[in-house]
Amino acid sequence: MVGYDPKPDGRNNTKLQVAVAGSVSGLVTRALISPFDVIKIRFQLQHERLSRRDPNAKYHGIFQASRQILQEEGLTAFWKGHIPAQILSIGYGAVQFLSFEMLTELVHRGSVYDAREFSVHFVCGGLAACTATLTVHPVDVLRTRFAAQGEPKVYNTLRHAVGTMYRSEGPQVFYKGLAPTLIAIFPYAGLQFSCYSSLKHLYKWAMPAEGKKNENLQNLLCGSGAGVISKTLTYPLDLFKKRLQVGGFEHARAAFGQVRRYKGLMDCAKQVLQKEGALGFFKGLSPSLLKAALSTGFMFFWYEFFCNVFHCMNRTASQR
């Protein structure tokens, strides 16, 4: 299970093994879902309606956007910003899972609460994600800039992007969108961890004995379900974050349609509601749900997989 397990037969992974499992989980998951992330970001940053009826809309559907990106920018466009994204995923995965395991253990040892309760997993999951976000947010800004730029490219390399952004916008550029990110990530990650735990209990209750044997499938399905639930409930804040992160980068967005400037989180929400309607808060939701199902499913699947591998290694070593 994810989180501290007080049972005597629970996993006995070291802190380093937990961090490595989280890192590898993030690395593999990111490589697999990068195309969905690029499409999602393009949708979120488009001010025109995602509809065929709007003649000014560059993108209006997942398949149409995929074809257009492929035709205009080539296959590698689906992995734009992949290097900063991988750095982000590796660091984020390590810090998030390590923090979560330590926090749930702290709750178990220092309070009367059960470390496996829904509310405990929600709070610990949210705090763990906020810790990871503070650690890797500058890389997230770089990833968004790379994924958002079209052709010709504004940034050619990671080093070029860092230097250009620092000189033209100052050091604060690397923490653009931090407030909505933290506001969004706490409930999102909290729901991921708590829903994953709850869905696993529900799965064990609902499935016949034969279906319980395949633990890897169980982890994948429950992780996917947790991803869909958490993403749907917190999606508007993710959209605000992306809009704010490309502030000052409007010249590179000219080829994608309208360009707007936002003074902050509340101004962004107000402008989206006034000019794009309530549905504007959910632009890019369809690729986001697909991405959330895959990414969260893979995240928990690979994390549990590698933790189990380390657990088996530890048990074998102790028996020698």
Swiss-Prot record:
Solcar repeats lie at residues 13-106, 116-202, 214-309. The lineage of its organism: Eukaryota, Metazoa, Chordata, Craniata, Vertebrata. InterPro entries: Mit_carrier, Mitochondrial_sb/sol_carrier, Mt_carrier_dom_sf. It catalyses: thiamine phosphate(out) + thiamine diphosphate(in) = thiamine phosphate(in) + thiamine diphosphate(out). It comes from the Eukaryota. This is Mitochondrial thiamine pyrophosphate carrier. The chain crosses the membrane at residues 19-39, 87-107, 122-142, 173-193, 220-240, 293-313. It is found in: Mitochondrion membrane. GO terms for biological process: thiamine pyrophosphate transmembrane transport. It is a multi-pass membrane protein. Belongs to the mitochondrial carrier (TC 2.A.29) family. One of its GO terms (cellular component) is mitochondrial membrane. Its main location: mitochondrion. It comes from Macaca fascicularis (Crab-eating macaque). Keywords: Antiport, Membrane, Mitochondrion, Phosphoprotein, Repeat, Transmembrane, Transmembrane helix, Transport. Mitochondrial transporter mediating uptake of thiamine diphosphate into mitochondria. It is not clear if the antiporter activity is affected by the membrane potential or by the proton electrochemical gradient. The modification Phosphoserine is found at residue 51. One of its GO terms (molecular function) is antiporter activity. A motif (Substrate recognition) lies at residues 241-246. Signal peptide: none annotated.
